[in-house]
Amino acid sequence: MNKQSWLLNLSLLKTHPAFRAVFLARFISIVSLGLLGVAVPVQIQMMTHSTWQVGLSVTLTGGAMFVGLMVGGVLADRYERKKVILLARGTCGIGFIGLCLNALLPEPSLLAIYLLGLWDGFFASLGVTALLAATPALVGRENLMQAGAITMLTVRLGSVISPMIGGLLLATGGVAWNYGLAAAGTFITLLPLLSLPALPPPPQPREHPLKSLLAGFRFLLASPLVGGIALLGGLLTMASAVRVLYPALADNWQMSAAQIGFLYAAIPLGAAIGALTSGKLAHSVRPGLLMLLSTLGAFLAIGLFGLMPMWILGVVCLALFGWLSAVSSLLQYTMLQTQTPEAMLGRINGLWTAQNVTGDAIGAALLGGLGAMMTPVASASASGFGLLIIGVLLLLVLVELRRFRQTPPQVTASGS
């Protein structure tokens, strides 16, 4: 990233063909998954009229992703990573075809939606873990921070486009079109990924997978700095689970099917802006304090979201949450890489991703339960302000993270 500019440096896409292939595959994949992300909750809401059932689907998928991340970490360290990536992507596509066929039935099966969500969550996370493990070999460790920011921008831009497309498809063709195009897009991603070089795992002594994972957990618990970062990440993803209330809130705001897509696109849009303007974030003298404050601001935005009288104002609150959460997430990623020992980087990154998934699943379950007892407006506000109170307490408790200082990197002539 260029220190002299707020904007992200995209030069890696020009200088590293393998990373460019991953960039293209990831963008297509995110668009495909976005179509799926709109269709599943809307279909379940239409079938059951229950926010609890919508939350349950997200929780089950999140649980499967957590298991997949743990298993995927072991596979990525023992088998050729390119094969793991291709196998995981292809298997996900099969699950999407199943969702499409189920949606075409006269009476779609709710159980099938849940089971296929487990299938896709598990195999999708296998590919994510293998790709994370292979990234240093594709871009070099000196470029990992830049690659991480480009990856976030890719994910967010794809997440902005796909919900709006998904909303239009729902309004015109129904959920089967969303599932079918998601399957097609997933199989298309295999084409650029086939061009990747062989990605063998590094030579290392055999160790029982559970023993290796336990060592990572012990490090998280023993380090107030890294452990605090992971805790903030989990709470932030809990807040993002507010999306399970979108269908119910859309009814409250009397939104059309096409307008629902704007709710799903708002957070990724704000996060994309945050990633695109992240050029100077790495040079913050007090990244821990900035991380804590941006997280508190994100919680406040969610608390205000449900109170908005018009849906367009709710979209603004969601976009603000996306921007603040992107700032916090990029600081989390940077500090984890710099404060974690080299021998622990793989496990800590895997556990960080897994706890983000877990936070999302827990948040979805809690919001689904609140939605069954309270109005959607009250549920959204209670979750945001409740997390804000927890965040203020953490601001006081996480002293080492709050006081952490770093020396800003020197300006380079090339700016890269």
UniProtKB/Swiss-Prot annotation:
The chain crosses the membrane at residues 22-42, 56-76, 84-104, 110-130, 157-177, 179-199, 219-239, 257-277, 288-307, 314-336, 357-377, 379-399. GO terms for molecular function: enterobactin transmembrane transporter activity. Pfam families: MFS_3. Residues 43-55, 105-109, 178, 240-256, 308-313, 378 are periplasmic. The keyword Transport applies. It is a multi-pass membrane protein. SUPFAM superfamilies: MFS general substrate transporter. GO terms for cellular component: plasma membrane. InterPro entries: Enterobactin_exp_EntS (IPR023722), MFS_dom (IPR020846), MFS_trans_sf (IPR036259), TM_effector (IPR010290). Keywords: Cell inner membrane, Cell membrane, Membrane, Transmembrane, Transmembrane helix, Transport. Residues 1-21, 77-83, 131-156, 200-218, 278-287, 337-356, 400-416 are cytoplasmic. It comes from the Bacteria. Component of an export pathway for enterobactin. This is Enterobactin exporter EntS. It comes from Escherichia coli O6:K15:H31 (strain 536 / UPEC).
